[in-house]
Amino acid sequence: MLLEKVRKTRENMEIVVDSGQETVEIDRSQYIGGSDIPIILGISGFTKPNKLAQLKNKVIPYENKKTLYTEFGHIFEPFIREVANKKFNMNTVPCCKTSEELGLRANCDGYDSENSLLLEVKTNNGEHEDKSDYIVQIHFYMAMYDVKKCILAEYGRTKEEEEIINVVV
């Protein structure tokens, strides 16, 4: 099974830590990453599994499109991480762990090696009740980083923030 292969090889996977200047971004078109897991399982509302397969196999061009929603998340993520670090007395930093052999990439929002835990930050419209897509992504990261704990920090955009985004979009 894939999980067994991850367990056997994860010690050899280098962890790339964010320098603090910008978010760690390992080429998303090359690897299967955490955000791909809900798509593969058919529980993503954004992309279908067959389209993901076409993208990863370069049948259709991969576009790393930035949207206002993703940009909002990138802007807020460091602030949310800072608040979570203080609240839970931890020191998470953005990291990426990649397995060339397995073609996997775990680009996590926060990893605290001392406390052996992860932080996953999500921003949404505040109406994301079914967390199954978040949970499968988190489980993937937990397997890649060999941790048993992850804190999900979720920020629901205010009505005013949603209105601004909708006007701009």
Where are these regions (language model features)?
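Charged, glycine-rich intrinsically disordered N-terminal tails and low-complexity linkers that flank
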Residues: 1-75, 79, 87
